Structure formats: C-alpha cells, structure tokens
C-alpha cells in the first residue's frame, strides 16, 4: 500500500474513533430519550466497520493471513451465529438486548476492526494511537468540564462525559496509561511533556470520578512498570513457545477466576472484598453461572443475560436488592459463558491465546522495541482486568480490538501479493459491509422512530399516535414507554403491541405481565394458565407474578402452583393476604 493510502487509512480510523468517543444525542434534540450514548456508539461502530470492510475488499492483497488466524476468526463467527440462532430472540441477540447493544453484530464489527488494524506497520500505528489518545483526552476534558457545570451531557452527572456513566469513564481513562507510556517511548521531549500532562489530567479526572477501579488500573500500571524494570532479577526459563503460550492463556483464565471469587472471599481480599459494588456483582455473577449451567454449549444467546436475569437470580439477591434488575453480568468472563456458552467462550479464548502468542513471538524476534511492546501488553492486561469486573463501552472495546489486531498482524499477516482482483476474495468483506450497513440503517430508523414519538408523548401524555415498534429496540429499556404510547390507542392496541414484542422477544417480562393482567381483568380463566405459567417461569419473584399467579391458582384450584407460590413467598418473607387477586 502506498504511503499516501496508508496515511489516509490512519487519519480516517483516527477520526472515526474520535467520533465514536464523543458523539451522542444532545438533550436539546431529544430530551426524553432514555439512552443518548450507546445507540450512537453502535451506529458509528457499524458504519466505520462497514467502511473498513470495503477497504479490505478493495485492498484484499494486503489482508492475507496464516491459517491459524483465519481459523480463529472463523471459529468466532461460527460460534456467534450458532448462539444467535439458538437464542430464540434472533434480532435481540443480533443487535443486543441489554441497552448497551453488544450483540453479535458488534462482535462482527469489532472483528472487522481488528482485521483492518492488522495492516499497519509500527510507525503508522504510533500515529493512530495519537489520534486515539486525543479522543480519550477529549472525553476526559469534557468530563471535568461537566463536573464543574460548564457543560452538560446526557447520562449520569459528574464526570461521566459523553460515556453517560462514571464507571465507563473510569474504565476508559484507567486503561489509557499504558497507551500514554507507549506514545511517550516513541515521542520527542516536547511530546513526552504533553503526554505527561495528559496522564496527570487523567489522574485528576479519575479522582473526580471516584470508582475504585480507576485507582486499581493506575496501581496495576505502576506494578507493571516495576516488573519490567526488575525483569533482570526475575527467573525466566527458556521454555518453548507453545508452552509459554499455554501458560499465558492459563494465567488469564486463573486471573479471571480469581476476580470472580473476590466478592465471595470477603475480608480475605483487602479493600475490595467487602466493597458494596463488588458485593452486588457477586449476585450478578451467580445469576450468570446459573444461566451457563442450564445452557452449557451455546449459552442463552448473545447479549441475552438481562432477559434471563430474573429467572436465574438468587433468592438472596431478590431479598437484598429487590428493586435492582441487572441487564449485564458486569464481567466479560461471566457474560461470555452465560451468553455464548462453552463453544463461544473457547472461540474467544483461542483468539486471546493467539494474541498472547503474537506478543511472545514479537518479543523473541524484537520485531518491535521491547519497551513499546511491553506497554501494549500492559494495556491488554489492564483492559482485560477491567472487563472482568465491569461493562465496557463499544468505543472502549474498539481500542482493545484495534491493538490486538495490530499485534496479531505483525506475526500472522502474510506479505502483500499483487494479483488480479477476484470477486471471490472481495465477496466476503463486501457482504460484511452490506450486512453492517443494513443493520445500522434499520437500527437508526428504529431509534429515530421511537425518539420522535416519545417526544410527542412527553409533550402531551394523551396524544393519540400510531406507533410501530421495532424488534431492534430492547424490551428492557424501551417497552414500558412503547406500551404507554400504545395504550392511548386503546387496550386492544396495547395488547397487540405486547404480543408483537413477545413474538420477537419471548422473555419480555413487561409484555407478559400486561397480557396476563389483561386476561385477569377480563376474567378469562381458560387462557390464563399459559400466561401465568410463562410469567412464573421468566420472572418468578416479581410481586406482579406472585399476585397474578395466586389469583389463577385460587380460581382454578391449581394446588401444585399454589404450593409453589406459598413456598416462594415464605422464602421471600412475604405474607399472603387474600384480596381482589386471590
């Protein structure tokens, strides 16, 4: 690829990430929209990945890989497709049904992102990382400005900035320190001064943010540097590459397992063991392991954790945190096991092993300066650590997949080979671009349709407007508002909307409750059993579930259901008082 073309690729990718990091839906345009950050990130990612795919198709001679890398990508795609088809919620699993939109389509887009970044040599990649740091520092500055009420962004208050959440903010800034070090190692004195100021800015922003994970990231960064400086005193056996790769991969698994056990160890883990946020996560993780144990091979479906959470949450979780409903496991390891099962997890693990192997080969062959390589490895480690304890935004995932793609590309990308363009080589990336653009278009259309209607409803709660819901929008975040709009057209339209939602997402609890309540209010006992039993299956501990199910059990004489409900109520500490619904 010519120098000019590579420069254009660097500039485009850099600007694309800046857009992904800072773009959002301003409150002035759609003030009543629920989430003004994640939808924009998804659309931006899909469009950028589609353009990457077109570039890959046009420059296919640059994207030739060893078979092991091809097998890894193919395994990931295949496992995602199988989990997608087996989920029972095709569109929800494709786009994502947690409100953060991390379904299969985002995985495909991130894989394309990784492939695109595999083409870069060291010097262009340094320039690219500069763009990425500019974007992250823009987010940091925006967060600080918001903290002092100079500007205001949608989402949480304080320093959440364009990410909408202080945890997301802290995670992104905390993982940035190794990238700043990477640039400092490859910059002039003036550049190092600027980068030092950027690091200080991030520390100050983390101080304002408050989440403990940001300080832990900084601590891991300092410990990592100390290990590198003291490496000559650390025994390093001359083991074979395969053994070191296996040990590195196993170490990642053990580290993820240790983090999983942390909330259960309590006082054995100083500071963190009894942290409130850590304790809450233990309940999320137990729900995830129960989902996994019931769907071992392919999981409950990509990004379907939230739709299965109420069925699998523990009694302790229900009693302690009755009003907390989690749409995410808050752990990449638990979320992956629960949603894509053993097969999908092994596919991701294979790619992690490939990244580790690439780092080792580059280290041995000195393809890249070892200090710079260590900084990138430290970034990967700190990112993975964050992902094991917290949700990660799509813009944050973008950087991780970009770095991993670059590393793997240094080892497993074959030299370019001039040849005639064959449609067979262009077909797959062009098909990828078409799918990504199609999903982006349909998702954007669904968002705009929802936002425009919800604004009219917010202005006048009695307005009667025809609204056509889209399966692209999650039940968890959107259905309640959709139901309010539909109710203005009458109960029949609201019931029709609920049935449409359940046809696409059989685990939409709000829709199931509405249909069950409607049947109860109408005294439709014959058809009530199926509705009640389904509701009891997907949300057994909800007050609405217990009340409606008890009504049916008493009216129909269903002794078995009544006994199950009484046991459930006793466990939850509830007292049954006969009334209108029982």
Predicted regions and their residues:
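Short, hydrophobic transmembrane alpha-helix segments
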Residues: 25-38, 57-63
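Alpha-helical transmembrane segments of multi-pass inner-membrane proteins
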Residues: 2-28, 42-56, 73-85, 103-235, ...
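C-terminal luminal/periplasmic domains and tails of membrane-associated envelope-modifying transferases
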Residues: 457-582
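Internal/C-terminal transmembrane anchor helices
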Residues: 244-261, 420-447
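TM-adjacent membrane-interface loops and short helices in multi-pass inner/ER membrane proteins
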Residues: 165, 282-326, 333, 340-347
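Flexible juxtamembrane loops connecting transmembrane helices in multi-pass membrane enzymes
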Residues: 158-159, 221-222, 242, 255-293, ...
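Membrane-interface helix caps and helix-loop-helix hairpins in membrane proteins
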Residues: 92-97, 207-212, 387-394
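Membrane-interface interhelical loops and short amphipathic "cap" helices
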Residues: 27-36, 88-98, 148-163, 318-327
